[in-house]
Amino acid sequence: MTELPKAYEAKKIDEKWYQFWDAKRYFTANPLSNKPTYCIVIPPPNVTGVLHMGHALVNTVQDILIRWKRMLGFETLWVPGTDHAGIATQMVVERHLIKTEGKKRTDYTREEFLKHVWTWKEKSENRIIEQLKRLGNSCDWTRLRFTMDENNSLAVRTMFKKLFDDGLIYRGDYLVNWDPHTQTALADDEVEYEDKQSFLWYFKYPLRDESEFISIATTRPETMLGDTAVAVSPNDERFKHLIGKEIRLPLMNRLIPIIADHHVDPSFGTGVVKITPAHDPNDYQIGLSHRLPFINIMTPDGKINENGGHFQGLSMTEARHAVVSEMKEKGLLEKVEPHLNRVGISYRSKAIIEPYLSKQWFVKMDGFSKKLREVVQNGQVKLIPSHWESTYFHWIDNLRDWCISRQLWWGHRIPIWYHKEDSNRLICYAGSDLPDEVKNAPEEWIQDSDVLDTWFSSALWPFSTLGWPEQTSELAKFYPTSVLVTGHDILFFWVARMILMGDYALDQPPFPETYLLGLIYGKSYWRQESNGGILYVNEQERSDFDMGKPIPKEVFSKWEKMSKSKGNIIDPLEMIDQFGTDAVRMALCASATQARQIDLDRRRFEEFKNFTNKIWNGARFVLMNLDGNEQNRTMSLTSQGFSQGLDEALFTLEDRWILSVLNRTVESVNVHLNHYQFDQAAIEAYDFFWKEFCAYYVEIAKPILFGKIGTAQERTNKQKLLVIVLCQAIRLIHPMAPFITEELFHILKERLEGVEALTNADPYTKECIQALQSSACLVAPYPVRIGEKNQKVEAVFALMEQIVYTIRNIRGEMKLSPGTATDVYIIGQADDPEWQSAREHITMISALVKTRRILVETEEPKIGFACTGVYHALKIQLPLPEELLKQEKTRLNKEQEKLEISLEKLKNQLSNTDFVRRAPAHLTEKQNQQLSQTEQELREIKEKLMTLP
């Protein structure tokens, strides 16, 4: 048998087993299989860089589901792939070329630049794939996809043409969200909003004859250069006499009308607003209804154009200052008020978004909104957690046409050709070559230079990756997919649009369930500077604080979204190097609550590294003790002996208990995974292996295994049961921690090589032997409940646990060293069932606590000083030597003195009115928390002293 090293070497084991799985093609799906199917398409990571912790979480959760279903007997397909990420990738490559070659994108032809992007894509994609493999992801790598590969490109062109032919795609002049930095339009969902402190400027606009002025309020002085009207409410009596008259627009000397419109809020500003149809969404609608001129004053790169008069060439920000300054010089600036303004920001470049009149391609959404609502309302698509439904419906209620064209070079070129002489003559073509008309007269036609929104191709991902528009065997077998797992931040960007496209193309939503994970937050630490600023701590300090080093009083902390500037990013690959893949996966699984925010504590990785060590050591103990011990090798369990099965007549309380708890845990973990409660599944598996199996059952079994008590038959029965529980436990944990469990599975399989179940063997032995006949843990059957949960046995064992807990608690309170053995008295009534159980199971209790002897009595013993604990009607006493009592009193008195000094200092500080007035609120709050904590600790010390004689 392979000798288990004392230490668990994660890196060595990780590399070994991933290569094994890959070589055996365990991840490759068979579309001709008769098994039930389970399919997931990966949310394709962008080919812009490396994976972050959000990717690690989403992909770990998907891999857990795939591995679980594979072990349950499903034909599983997990489709991997990457996304071309139009804007993001183009920006990254542009920056790279400026840095490495000193050239801008416009210094290249389109074809030259795209060659550089494809080179970047290949390198980045290879790096991402290797990182996904390091996470242990069991994707079907034979079906690796890219959103711009040949089949996906065909799918995109086919979908565009289908929508175009059905009249659902149109091109028109429309006010779009314009990013001046990337010089492209953005969809509404790609704009983030921030509240920024700004101003409300009050200007005087003169009437045509300058007989009087009308006062208007605006947050965008620079756009007045494009004003084509001013508007008032038709119900506002103050201005009814002005409706129909004309204003002479200051600075531009242009006559514009005063109009009445119900959209005007009489309570805002002066009740009169400027109308700039080409640069404001609300004004755009007013401009359409009143047939106003649309004057664009901005160039694509965010500067004032020729329509802005002498302000031409200024940026929008510069123009704002210049307009305000000139209005002030002319005596037309009345006043300026502070105003909180909601500003749109590009989700990619972080540039301020400008409303911009532009010719773009759109998908009509009116016809889709009803269906999008219905599929969620009628349960065809479940959003999990369900609280996301209200957010989803709110988005549908405010749905506007989807702008799908982008002014970029990298992406799916819009499959439209225009006739050079007549732009209204156009061809929509889905083929991979050129339309016949273009082939025959190439000089007469030109293709649209824009590309499609990245999310257009991503919306086809669940079926384009399966071969659509071709009717492939994969599409027939695996569509619709089984579930989509992704972050809630792309519910509208991606999830809703996949539902839309899947239902439109295939008359069926692409998945019945969507599990939306929360966003990962990290702990930020900072110091308050004297000028009121914030200085984040360095990386070493952050790591120390994350791992539990006490935080100084001057350092503050809170959970925030991970960002480089805050220094709270946790790199998943660094965590893998430090703690091992299985530890990282289990930490992520245990953190994957159904909350909107997931606070990721770095100590969780250390916690689960300790757990993987516990799995290793627990399994090592079991396997070593199958060969007996150094004194007696005849205790060895043979394959033939194991085949005989368990002898239920020899079962002790702990045997029945561990099987009951095993059945309960197996059933519970399956239920949790079925309901996407990954944190609960991880905690159940963790508690079972560490607490129930190792801390209790293995410890209780040791005296029998070591030959100190029991018969040879009882010892053999214990060995068999240890194997059975270990075999189920490592398979139970495998989807969460696949590497260590695969290693242990093969060692156990080798140890019991040739084992065959006899027909009369018990179901536990048969199930174990069947599992060990599998070629890998990856494809072994996942545990399901095969026995009963024995509540009576669990109740009796719970009593033993409470007695053990009470004894350990007393020892801990009295600071008894682990090597100090004491007597234990358990006192109660002879007719009390709990007293009787305690007397019956003295041997079990002795195996779990360090004692000289355990005495179960009906009368209190006559002893000197003893510490006492109570559980129900039982009294548990530990006699203690007088010397130990003196030491404990001295220690507690010193601790009390120390706490009283700290308490006095805190009280003096908080009673100092000058300190309270000057200190920031978060500092006084922290001091108050310390005060409460110190008072609580002092109370506990005094209570302990009162119990001592």
UniProtKB/Swiss-Prot annotation:
What this protein catalyses is: tRNA(Val) + L-valine + ATP = L-valyl-tRNA(Val) + AMP + diphosphate
What residue intervals hold the motif 'KMSKS' region? 561-565
**Is Ligase one of the keywords?**
yes
Record's InterPro entries?
aa-tRNA-synth_I_CS, aa-tRNA-synth_Ia, Anticodon_Ia_Val, M/V/L/I-tRNA-synth_anticd-bd, Rossmann-like_a/b/a_fold, tRNA-bd_arm, tRNAsynth_Ia_anticodon-bd, Val-tRNA_synth_C_sf
- Any one GO molecular-function label of the UniProt entry: aminoacyl-tRNA deacylase activity
Complexes and interactors:
Monomer.
Q: What does this protein do?
A: Catalyzes the attachment of valine to tRNA(Val). As ValRS can inadvertently accommodate and process structurally similar amino acids such as threonine, to avoid such errors, it has a 'posttransfer' editing activity that hydrolyzes mischarged Thr-tRNA(Val) in a tRNA-dependent manner.
Protein name according to UniProt: Valine--tRNA ligase
